[in-house]
Amino acid sequence: MAAVLKPVLLGLRDAPVHGSPTGPGAWTASKLGGIPDALPTVAAPRPVCQRCGQPLALVVQVYCPLEGSPFHRLLHVFACACPGCSTGGARSWKVFRSQCLQVPEREAQDAQKQGNSLAAEDWCEGADDWGSDTEEGPSPQFTLDFGNDASSAKDVDWTARLQDLRLQDAVLGAAHPVPPGLPLFLPYYICVADEDDYRDFVNLDHAHSLLRDYQQREGIAMDQLLSQSLPNDGDEKYEKTIIKSGDQTFYKFMKRIAACQEQILRYSWSGEPLFLTCPTSEVTELPACSQCGGQRIFEFQLMPALVSMLKSANLGLSVEFGTILVYTCEKSCWPPNHQTPMEEFCIIQEDPDELLFK
């Protein structure tokens, strides 16, 4: 039986973030750039580059709670924007996960007793239910959520919950002022779309144009590259060619994103990442969660279109990458009364040709 494909949600750049939002309106929003927002009772991450020692700039903030879970959940991805660290690899990138209770302690305990079978919340406010994967398994299932969708919030009065947290969040924010000189990218909200909504509008002209340029540089025949990536007579076998595996991986990447080239983020909890280059042993040798020892799973990745959107608010900063693969604790563990963000893991795949995405 064929494996059930996990749904994929796409993150797109939306409106600029104006001013300095605070409270739940800030930390329940997904965004690129700006200042990292902190959940109530959890300190905002302030990482530094392991290569140069300078503060890291926030690349994206993703609000991704679980329906049925007692926790708010926030992920931050940081990078070093210093020119000398553009090729610093994992030492110049950091990922952090923060969680805090969104219901009183007694209700949280009752929710935990109901088991780990958690459905996914929608990723954006007012979004339609794009279909949760109903495949049975012991692990919770995640998607992203921008707000309080009635279909997923069910009978919980989220407005009251968030209002109760405003004062506490304001106090925490006052206790952790933004350090002067913190590198910042201009902030924009991230909106969401279902990748399936783009399937009927695929235009491969742009992908083919880029691949023709690639072919001329590498001396590779286009028909070979295409045949290596297309099914043969409807089955799962591919034609055998002399194409390098890296070229096949690259073409599959370009073909998949052709329908929505402006995507800056792909989210598919426990799904399959879209590799830009051939995966290395890092993918099969992921480090275990440092807190619970459990395994990590793929959650989302940052896409090449994001690079040109990371415009600096100061100091002329920039980052370069092909795609960033983010892996998080499968159990999304969070000890009682924990108050500091937990570090997760990311894999950096460099752009095989930076000019292709500009």
Swiss-Prot record:
**Keyword Cell cycle on this protein?**
yes
Residues bearing the modification Phosphoserine? S20
Cellular component GO terms, alphabetically?
A: cytoplasm; membrane
Tissues expressing this chain:
Higher expression in lung, colon, mammary gland, cervix, stomach and small intestine.
- One record GO biological process: apoptotic process
Q: Which residues carry this modification: N-acetylalanine?
A: A2
* Keywords on record: Acetylation, Cell cycle, Phosphoprotein
Q: Which residues carry this modification: Phosphothreonine?
A: T22
Q: What does this protein do?
A: Over-expression suppresses AP1, CREB, NFAT, and NF-kB transcriptional activation, and delays cell cycle progression at S phase.
Report the PANTHER family cross-referenced here: PROGRAMMED CELL DEATH PROTEIN 2-LIKE
This protein is called: Programmed cell death protein 2-like
Q: Which gene encodes it?
A: PDCD2L
